């Protein structure tokens, strides 16, 4: 690369930690224009891959397959398939917009799969108005199973790939790699069942399935049969949100399609989340003890399992989220994986820890125990220990957790034959246990492999005690500061309504905890007045519903009808037409996503405000409402044209009626 530094992580390989490829943690970055040579012994075989671990480069396609064959393996035709995605939007822009709670991705998906926005018009159409209202009462935004809209999915870097050399009766080993930045893939095959024989490069006892889902960064080896000549059979990879798909065609001739996955039933999923979400944002599994993907709460949205009609909440007892109990379609889960050889840990002291996976979509903060990588110390472990980690996912998103430089046992009821993996997908409300032998030295990253979650801080660093200084990073303190920068990034957002009656907008410059925001209302005539407010503060709580801030409030208005000032709602003299004060206060998100703003200023004046923005009346038509104790009020309709522009009309108690265009960045 000519203009920026990069790195190379050897995903799943056992190698010296200083070659692991995490810049500023284990390895020096590869500077622009430089060449880096990696030399290490190969200690394993299987399906692996490599990718950049620098910023968001992986989203731009900096990855590839790494296949290590056994010295003495059964001869079999094979095909490598690395799955990935492409967005026309720059990855930095994707990341910035995720932190602004912007739902342009959902609007784009709606064009392909109607219903993804889950607007009020969608709810009424589906007879789910009560479900939508309950969802917002519990302070949740619309449900989505993936964060990002992608313009294309790729099979080996192509929208569709094909291999024509396979003949009838041949058994083909397909080495599947999910090289996506944030996409899960459902895998199905037009030629019949698939036999899973390896996961994350390590053999498992063969298990026959109809389909399985691949978490980000997972690899699976499957064996499929080519049923007949003169036919090409589709190996179909469908994104979890079912908006896009890509294919690998095996064989030549007439194309035999795999059955496409039908659109998700989003309001069934919303009802499920309503049932399981507490008012404080915690999740309640209702005593189901979910683990190992056996109880998939999303099954209520799958029409191929629960039927096309809205009957997914029929009483099926403890099996109501178990797809294998509800259907003849066999879906792989981790409990079905078994190592062909013993994976028992060696004797040694046990170090046990518990991690709670936390996060919220509104401000896109993802963490472990509500702390990001930069907010925690490295976790010390000793060589010779056995480390057990109990993971509970208390967030609404699934997380593929990846451990560098080690394979862990997935404790799944198989005893000494628990499967070995380096990535484990943990679904909402699941509790899963992994354990590994601490046999290495140095520092090793443990993180969510959804790229934008990792960049937001969802991870930890395991550090072996008594590790010698890393020659790759001679200034360890400086390297640690640079490594911690990723989840400290600040993001700028602005929204401005260029209307006929004035200019109305806000700007924010914020990171994971802090926010500097400014609002303005600038009338074109002196009786409309001018107002500017600025706030700086910190968000508190796991869900970040509380924002404590200090700020400045300046406003002036001349010749306003009504003469002498009126009292405000608190019985104090209303100073809304002339005010220059500092203030202290807080904003708190109430049920129905109403934001309460309560403050006291340096003149002793109390002020309160209720506001609700971005009410989705239809997928593109939005409503904003505001009222405050100064007896001001506002209502605005916006029709979203694209990710930047919207048509608007609003009525403001001071500036009157106006129409215009709104900019969102």
Predicted regions and their residues:
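Membrane-embedded beta-strands of outer-membrane beta-barrel proteins
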Residues: 505, 534-536, 584-586, 608-612, ...
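Active/binding-pocket-proximal capping segment
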Residues: 190-204, 371-373, 394-421, 452-453, ...
